[in-house]
């Protein structure tokens, strides 16, 4: 017997706070269908505690559950921790009395090395790859799309004279150095560096691979990167545009902080040359951003520190001007590696007239530096399109659902354990147990070597999912694959073999590289048409932010389904992040503007999936009526506003409960359910003005959560459930 259970993940920041308010509603309703909704804490704080055996390892438990047919997991956004975030969480846990060690910057002892290994496993995007035992099906639900068309979000106008542009490398990057092979047989591989002095260093051993698996190797060359950055910094100064860099230091937790460090060092080249010894003496690490370097300077003698700080200010003055993250606090694009994440920052800029903010808090044309050229054309073509045709119009634009390859840590997003900053010149080789060299790349000191894996079963599953979505929608379906790229050529061979086994009669299926696919898709978007994108793991991430942000104003409103390969379901609540600024506003003035629409959508499909899997008709009914209620929340404008004095996240949860109860009371297919929910619908409707008044009354004052990464449950419940009337109605139900 399949258990009637849904796991609702407790995560971080704004979505975690929203859970304190929404979950009691969900549990009360689901209980009437015999469905238990249980939480598992996979927040950053909980994962740190689990790493040192101070809490259950809920993530490992869910990783195992995801490999079973019973899995029904609702996954909310979580923090992909950068080192500064990780250190802040550790400090908070230590202050609460938990015996977790400091994060060791430069581990010396065996104990410190063990702690560093444990923390490195928690760092970056450590959650999603464990749960994603399937591929991704992301699309804008019809109700959300129609709402966006009738209530368009703001889109900054584009000038045909815009000087904004993408700068990317033309050689010496991962894209241009990639080599790839498909293995005929299962094997155990090792990655080794054969230095020019004759020594061999094993970088990784015991790497198990399956028959049919694709292995890639590529190198980001330090010398080429430095030359490229120096050239682009000078060019931004000459063109008088803002300089900005767009990486993904959260997910690409080994390679991208190193690349980010090179950007910091190149921009402040004079400072790092003149004060090399002084900076080294306090362990200043550009990979942690300018913010980290400035913090380290505090340990220098006052006079020296002032000299370095003045040199930094002089660099700012000579330009180019840097794009700002928070101009009021002087936080630039180069302060924190995790502040500017390419898949969120580029769509935001494209939506804002192709501009970013300068130190004077004005929008300005910008150079968007995306060093590796693998996917940069997505953004350069979109910028060219907006320059030629103006901003997109949400009232008429089409839609771009995505079928994304991500199961079993496919491609770059599973490469962290196979990414190395090279210490000595030589050749990095990928070798099997018989000593056969499968792949090799020449390297110099400071180069970043990266190997990726893509297993056969996920590719087959991805192609089948693409065909199912093409069949269900009738929309043209584009595989974003570039036959001139080593990895993509291997994938294409598999795709063609899989399609030969499928019924594709009457389907329109195209194969285009990133540049061609972007042009083709944008032309159709401007005509109001639907185009399915079938992409690898990185483009899945990029496209499911870019198009939802342009179409809907946010990627948090996407339906994000992961049909797990063993038959279960993972339902992700949108494709956005965890909104730290929303938490800051809540703490300051007890107003949470987080929109739980993503949770509503995911819960609806989760309940319908459970109903189908188990024959629980009432669970299915809860799902369909929740969809109806969600539509009403949108149409009657009950989503959170932005400012104090209007309803926020908590108010939207009250209206969802009201409309959901009313939909259940009004339906005729389950008379018992109608009778059960009728009284609740009546009492909530009667109490509406009282509940809204209670919710608004708390706004405008600071709120105490008793923590940030590790909040106090009772305090946070009190903050997030301030309406005694609403709480009593749910409790008596």
Where are these regions (language model features)?
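Short, charged, amphipathic alpha-helical segments
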Residues: 674-682
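A glycine-biased, small/acidic residue-tolerant capping/turn segment at secondary-structure junctions
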Residues: 692-708
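Short, charged/polar, low-complexity loop and linker segments
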Residues: 660-669
């Amino acid at each position: 017997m399949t258990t009637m259970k849904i796991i609702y993940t407790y995560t971080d920041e704004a979505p975690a706070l929203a859970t304190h308010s929404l979950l009691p509603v969900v549990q009360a309703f689901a209980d009437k269908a015999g469905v238990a909704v249980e939480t598992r804490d996979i927040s950053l704080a909980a994962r740190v505690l689990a790493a040192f055996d101070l809490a259950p390892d809920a993530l490992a438990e869910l990783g195992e559950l995801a490999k079973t047919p019973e899995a029904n997991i609702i996954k909310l956004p979580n923090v992909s921790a950068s080192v500064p975030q990780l250190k802040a969480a550790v400090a908070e846990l230590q202050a609460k009395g938990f015996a977790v060690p400091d994060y060791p910057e430069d581990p010396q002892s065996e104990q410190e090395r063990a702690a560093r290994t444990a923390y490195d496993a928690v760092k970056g995007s450590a959650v999603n790859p464990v749960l994603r035992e399937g591929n991704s099906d992301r699309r804008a639900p019809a109700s959300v799309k129609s709402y966006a068309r009738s209530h368009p979000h703001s889109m900054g106008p584009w000038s045909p004279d815009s000087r904004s542009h993408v700068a990317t490398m033309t050689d010496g990057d991962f894209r241009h150095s990639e080599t790839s092979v498909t293995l005929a047989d299962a094997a155990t591989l090792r990655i080794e560096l054969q230095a020019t002095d004759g020594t061999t260093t094993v970088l990784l051993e015991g790497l198990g691979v399956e028959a049919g698996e694709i292995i890639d190797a590529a190198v980001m060359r330090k010398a080429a990167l430095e030359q490229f950055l120096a050239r682009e910094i000078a060019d931004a100064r000459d063109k008088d545009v803002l300089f900005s860099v767009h990486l993904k230091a959260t997910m690409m937790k080994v390679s991208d902080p190193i690349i980010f460090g090179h950007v910091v060092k190149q921009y402040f080249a004079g400072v790092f040359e003149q004060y090399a010894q002084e900076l080294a003496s306090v362990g200043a690490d550009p990979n942690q951003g300018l913010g980290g370097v400035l913090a380290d300077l505090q340990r220098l003698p006052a006079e020296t520190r002032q000299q370095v700080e003045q040199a930094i200010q002089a660099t700012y003055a000579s330009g180019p001007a840097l794009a700002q993250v928070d101009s009021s606090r002087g936080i630039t694009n180069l302060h924190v590696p995790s502040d500017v994440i390419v898949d969120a920052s580029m769509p935001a800029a494209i939506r804002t007239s192709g501009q970013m903010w300068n130190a004077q808090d004005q929008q300005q044309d910008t150079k968007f530096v995306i060093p590796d050229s693998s996917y940069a054309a997505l953004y350069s073509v979109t910028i060219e399109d907006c320059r030629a045709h103006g901003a997109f119009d949400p009232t008429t634009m089409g839609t771009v659902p995505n079928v994304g390859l991500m199961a079993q840590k496919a491609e770059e997003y599973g490469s962290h354990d196979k990414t190395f900053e090279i210490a000595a010149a030589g050749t990095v080789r990928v070798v099997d147990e018989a000593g056969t060299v499968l792949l090799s790349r020449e390297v110099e000191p400071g180069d970043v070597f990266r190997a990726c894996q893509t297993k056969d079963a996920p590719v087959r599953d991805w192609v089948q999912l693409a065909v199912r979505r093409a069949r269900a929608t009738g929309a043209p379906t584009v595989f974003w694959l570039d036959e001139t790229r080593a990895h993509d050529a291997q994938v294409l061979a598999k795709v063609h073999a899989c399609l030969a086994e499928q019924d594709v009669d009457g389907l329109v299926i195209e194969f285009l590289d990133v540049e061609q696919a972007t042009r083709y898709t944008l032309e159709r978007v401007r005509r109001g048409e639907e185009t399915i994108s079938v992409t690898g793991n990185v483009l899945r991430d990029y496209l499911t932010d870019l198009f939802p942000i342009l179409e809907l104003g946010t990627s948090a409103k996407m339906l994000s389904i992961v049909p797990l390969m063993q038959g279960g379901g993972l339902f992700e609540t949108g494709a956005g992040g965890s909104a730290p600024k929303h938490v800051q506003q809540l703490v300051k003035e007890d107003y949470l503007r987080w929109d739980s629409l993503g949770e509503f959508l995911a819960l609806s499909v989760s309940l319908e999936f459970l109903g189908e899997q188990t024959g629980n008709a009432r669970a299915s009914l809860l799902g369909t009526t929740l969809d109806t209620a969600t539509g009403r929340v949108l149409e009657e404008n009950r989503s959170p506003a932005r400012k104090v004095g209007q309803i926020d996240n908590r108010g939207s949860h009250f209206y969802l409960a009201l409309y959901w109860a009313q939909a259940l009371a009004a339906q005729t297919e389950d008379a018992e359910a109608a009778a059960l929910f009728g009284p609740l619908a009546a009492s909530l409707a009667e109490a509406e003005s009282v509940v809204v008044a209670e919710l608004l009354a708390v706004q405008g004052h600071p709120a105490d959560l008793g923590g940030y990464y590790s909040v106090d449950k009772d305090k946070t419940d009190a903050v997030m459930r301030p309406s005694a009337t609403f709480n009593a109605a749910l409790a008596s139900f």
